[in-house]
């Protein structure tokens, strides 16, 4: 009993005598909510207008600071969802997620552009980016559970991705290529009737 008490007393003394800095990097912005900012990072990424905020996201993306670019682009969508800059913000979200290796989330971000902003100037580029992502899954990239843990490779889901591409742009340049890849995914699936 005395030994346990002595160890507890020593550990408490170490905590009191050798404290470490533990800043609370959570910030609250009225109307936006809470966000986490790593200690020592520059928090000067917020701007009062959508165009300026999108410029911050674009500059951060080209500097390969994908975390800041994601935050800035998400802020454009959260604060100014009906802005003319919202499709470009969604596009940069997809590009950042793709650069971080989160291909499923990037595909969904690109799908949001197609569904929410069908007249976007980046429509054709988005279709080709979705096609490239689906090709990576066709090549054997694994789908992830909770966006982090690689779990399985599914040709059925890959064929579904190519099918979405065909449905998004049936008369686009990418549609015939995607239709051929649907067949390739089904062939790799090896779950078809033989005669």
Region roles according to the model:
Residues 9-17:
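Bacterial N-terminal signal peptides
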Residues 20-195:
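Acidic, polar-rich low-complexity tracts and alpha-helical solenoid repeat scaffolds
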